[in-house]
Amino acid sequence: MKVIFMQDVKGRGKRGQVKDVPNGYAQNYLIKQGLAKEANKCNLNTLKRVEANEKAEYEAQKAAAQEIKKQLEADETVVELKAKAGSDSRLFGSISSKKIIEGLDKQFGIKLDKHKLELREPIKVLGYTNVPVKLFKGVESKVRVHVTQEN
């Protein structure tokens, strides 16, 4: 019996895959557990539609990430932050990814999730810092952050 796997089944098939399996296994286990559906014309058309929607959504997310990358890599996109610092240019506190995200939103209207910033440790010195950003699978950029002394 041909079935369409709705979920990954170890040793049998992956989600969305159409495979031939024994009748008893398909009817008594896969279909009853909701792991697969019978591969008839209607279900195959539904599978094609779902795959097309997923691909379109993936492409839309990738295009949005590319647009944000363009904005981040523009010359004028530098996040300006102020912090109290000592005479040796070391900050009394630190600049976290949350503050960088807030600065991006306030200054440029770019909304990002703080988990997309790959800041290994908070910024603790005055000056310019490049912070890597992973926007999407295969789409990476850098945010330039300029920390100045607060009066």
Curated annotation (Swiss-Prot):
GO terms for biological process: translation. Keywords: Ribonucleoprotein, Ribosomal protein, RNA-binding, rRNA-binding. Pfam families: Ribosomal_L9_C (PF03948), Ribosomal_L9_N (PF01281). One of its GO terms (cellular component) is ribosome. The keyword Signal does not apply. GO terms for molecular function: rRNA binding; structural constituent of ribosome. InterPro entries: Ribosomal_bL9 (IPR000244), Ribosomal_bL9/RNase_H1_N (IPR009027), Ribosomal_bL9_bac/chp (IPR020594), Ribosomal_bL9_C (IPR020069), Ribosomal_bL9_C_sf (IPR036791), Ribosomal_bL9_N (IPR020070), Ribosomal_bL9_N_sf (IPR036935). NCBIfam families: L9. HAMAP family: Ribosomal_bL9. Binds to the 23S rRNA. Belongs to the bacterial ribosomal protein bL9 family. This is Large ribosomal subunit protein bL9. The lineage of its organism: Bacteria, Bacillati, Bacillota, Bacilli, Lactobacillales.
